[in-house]
Regions:
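Ribosome large-subunit tunnel/peptidyl-transferase-proximal elements
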Residues: 2-158, 163-223
């Protein structure tokens, strides 16, 4: 049975309308645009911002969502990551709606590459944190780091990054472990570092919220 996502003509046109409405195609100023993305942009707007090619952006989205479906079908785990302050709530929302682990505060160096230490920290969080009389500031720091990871029992089968440049260290750890990387990929990033780039605007909440709802729909098999 073919499980690949297909977009009928009307659905495709609707998706293009949504891309325009939610400013998905709006990239960075040309001087901040990575030359690697020249082949996926269609030009510049009047303000001098790069504009993604809508067909290529849609194709990248379909490819990424198909991969997410594949991971889900195999009962795999996707770790959602977005440590930029304005992403805190949206990352938590996606994690809770998809019943997936997430990191929306700070990235603890070695979280993936030093998995034994990470798993011990998660175990500590689950078993002891609420019982220990830690100072409020220290307790909050630990809770912010591990709240979204409390159900993570093993290394994830893939990671999803909302802002590549804000979490570049995450990509390095994932690549060293051959963990597939899905990421919203703006015009100022290196596409070579990402296995499943979703070509689109990662600088604003509006397009990220749009992508997030599509991801949630994919998990609930409504796409």
């Amino acid at each position: 049975m073919n499980t690949q996502l297909s977009l009928p003509l009307k659905r495709k046109n609707l998706l293009e309308d949504h891309f325009l409405r939610y400013k998905v195609l709006l990239g960075n100023k040309l001087k901040f645009t990575n030359p690697q993305t020249y082949e996926v942009i269609s030009g510049l707007n009047f303000a001098g911002n790069s504009i993604f090619d809508v067909e290529k952006s849609i194709a990248s989205l379909k490819r990424a969502l198909n991969f997410i479906q594949k991971v889900q079908a195999n009962e795999g785990i996707i770790l959602f990551i977005g440590t930029r302050p304005d992403l805190k709530e949206i990352v938590k929302y996606v994690g809770s709606k998809t019943n997936s682990p997430y990191v929306n505060d700070r990235w603890s160096k070695g979280l993936l590459t030093n998995w034994e230490n990470t798993s011990n920290s998660i175990r500590f969080y689950n078993l002891f944190l609420k019982k220990l009389g830690l100072r409020a500031k220290k307790k909050k720091k630990i809770m912010d780091t591990f709240l979204g990871l409390k159900n993570l029992k093993k290394l994830p089968d893939a990671i999803f990054v909302f802002d590549v440049n804000a979490d570049i260290d995450v990509l390095k750890e994932a690549k060293s472990l051959n963990i597939p990387i899905i990421a919203i990929s703006d015009t100022n990033v290196s596409l070579n570092d990402i296995d499943y780039p979703i070509l689109g605007n990662s600088g604003s909440i509006l397009p990220l919220a749009f992508f997030s709802n599509l991801i949630i729909s994919t998990f609930t098999k409504k796409v």
